[in-house]
């Protein structure tokens, strides 16, 4: 499979981040087993893309994880498991993996790899993912994610059930609910553990 791997340089973060999005993944049980067994070749953040609202949502979790990594504040094994944990609005690591991480039934997968060593390059990550992920690569953008996101599951995970109660106030009939939801989940990521 070819990859639509994107390499990003986030503001204030010295490490490049490699991100790929896949649909119709056929080998999720294999990928999950590689993580569980601790296979160093599969040190990635494998995220169930149905739990990702937008590009900003994903990159907020990635930013938090890398920032915690750079400041020696990891609560999990490495920056990649910390990325999955960073999606969570609470401090329960196991719960974050259940809700946001890859499962045997995952069909849409967001893959994140942080270049924590010089040998992790765009080319090496692209080649490994092309060999390892049996799925259709798609662009990592808001349009694609909007077709994948399970809004009901996301609202439940972030306890935002009452968020949609505002009346429509725009000419096109929208009320900015999507933007409010995005800001709420990003706020939950930023504030986790602040109390």
From Swiss-Prot:
Highest rank taxon of the organism: Eukaryota
Pfam families noted in UniProt: CGI-121
Any one GO CC term of the record: nucleus
GO biological process, one term: tRNA threonylcarbamoyladenosine modification
Disulfide bridge map: none
InterPro entries on file: CGI121/TPRKB (IPR013926), CGI121/TPRKB_sf (IPR036504)
Keyword Manganese: no
Cellular compartment(s): Nucleus; Chromosome, Telomere
Record keywords, A-Z: Activator, Chromosome, Nucleus, Telomere, Transcription, Transcription regulation, tRNA processing
Primary localisation category: nucleus
Oligomeric and partner information: Component of the EKC/KEOPS complex composed of at least bud32, cgi121, gon7, kae1 and pcc1; the whole complex dimerizes.
Similarity comment: Belongs to the CGI121/TPRKB family.
Biological role stated in the UniProt entry: Component of the EKC/KEOPS complex that is required for the formation of a threonylcarbamoyl group on adenosine at position 37 (t(6)A37) in tRNAs that read codons beginning with adenine. The complex is probably involved in the transfer of the threonylcarbamoyl moiety of threonylcarbamoyl-AMP (TC-AMP) to the n6 group of a37. Cgi121 acts as an allosteric effector that regulates the t(6)A activity of the complex. The EKC/KEOPS complex also promotes both telomere uncapping and telomere elongation. The complex is required for efficient recruitment of transcriptional coactivators.
Identification of the protein by name: EKC/KEOPS complex subunit cgi121
């Amino acid at each position: 499979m070819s990859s639509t791997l994107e390499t990003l340089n986030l503001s204030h973060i010295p490490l490049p981040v490699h991100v790929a999005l896949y649909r119709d993944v056929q080998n999720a049980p294999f990928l999950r087993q590689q993580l569980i067994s601790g296979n160093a070749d599969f040190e990635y953040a494998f995220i169930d893309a149905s739990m990702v609202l937008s590009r900003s949502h994903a990159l907020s979790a990635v930013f938090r994880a890398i920032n915690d990594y750079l400041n020696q504040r990891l609560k999990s094994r490495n920056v990649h498991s910390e990325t999955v944990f960073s999606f969570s609005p609470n401090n329960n690591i196991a719960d974050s993996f259940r809700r946001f991480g890859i499962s045997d039934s995952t069909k849409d997968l967001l893959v994140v790899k942080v270049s924590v060593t010089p040998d992790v390059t765009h080319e090496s990550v692209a080649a490994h993912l092309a060999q390892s992920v049996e799925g259709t690569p798609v662009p990592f953008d808001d349009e694609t994610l909007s077709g994948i996101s399970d809004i009901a599951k996301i609202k439940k995970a972030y306890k935002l059930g009452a968020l949609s109660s505002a009346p429509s106030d725009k000419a096109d009939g929208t009320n900015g609910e999507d933007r409010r939801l995005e800001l709420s989940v990003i706020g939950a990521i930023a504030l986790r553990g602040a109390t």
